[in-house]
Amino acid sequence: DEMVKARFVEMFGDPVSNPYDWNLKGLLQLGDCKNGMNFHSTDAGVNIHCLGVGDFKNLSCISDTSKLPTVSLTDIPSDEYMLKDGDIVFVRSNGNKALVGRSLVVYPATTPTTFSGFCIRFRLNSDEVKADYLLRVLKTDSIRKKMAGRGANIQNLNQKILGELQIPVPPLDLQNRFASFVEQTEKTKTTISHSLDKLETLKKALMQEYFG
C-alpha cells in the first residue's frame, strides 16, 4: 500500500491542498450513500453474505465476497442494500474510534452480498471518477482529518460529513493509468504471496522427510 500511496501523491498531489488545481466536486455530486441494514437475532429464512466492520482490517479491496460471513434474514434485502461492483463502503460507527472512516471497495460480482448497519455504502453514479482513484482519495490522511473535523478521530461518520467532502476530479486518462498501476501492484503482491505459500509447504515437506 505504501507504493500505491506514493504513486497517488506523485500523480495527483494531496486532495485537500489540490496542488494541480483539479476541478472539485462534492462527494454526493458523484454518487449516493446508504446506511447498512440492522439485523435481529430472530431473523431466519434467507442466508446472505454480509460485510461488517470486522472484515475491513487493513484491506483496500474485497474481490471475493463469498468468503465473508453470512447473516440470516427474513427476506432478501432490497437492491439498495445489495452491494455492487465498485461500491465503496465506510465504517460508520465502532467502539474503536480509529476505525471509523475506514473505507474499501468491493467487487461481489454474482455473489449476493449486503452490509451491516455499522457501515455506509457509497455508489458512484458519475463517469467523472473511477472507484480506484476515489478510494485512494478517501483513504488519504488529509481527507480522514476532514472527516474527523476538530477531533483526532471521528466519533461517528454520517452522510452529512461525507457530503461536505470535496473531491478533486483529474482527467480520466490519468485516473485510468493509476488504476492500472494499482491492479499490477495487487497482482504482484498475490504472486509473491502464492510463492511464499509454496515455499512454506515445501519446507514442511522437507522437515517431515528428514526429521519425521
List each model region and its residues.
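Sequence-specific dsDNA recognition surfaces
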Residues: 28-40, 54-87
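A short glycine-rich beta-alpha junction/loop motif
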Residues: 38, 111-120, 129-132, 151-176
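Short, solvent-exposed loop/turn positions at domain surfaces
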Residues: 76-77, 151, 190
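Non-catalytic DNA-recognition/assembly elements of restriction-modification systems
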Residues: 2-37, 164-176, 184-206, 210-212
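Short coil/turn segments at secondary-structure boundaries
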Residues: 20-23, 40-47, 65-66, 149-151
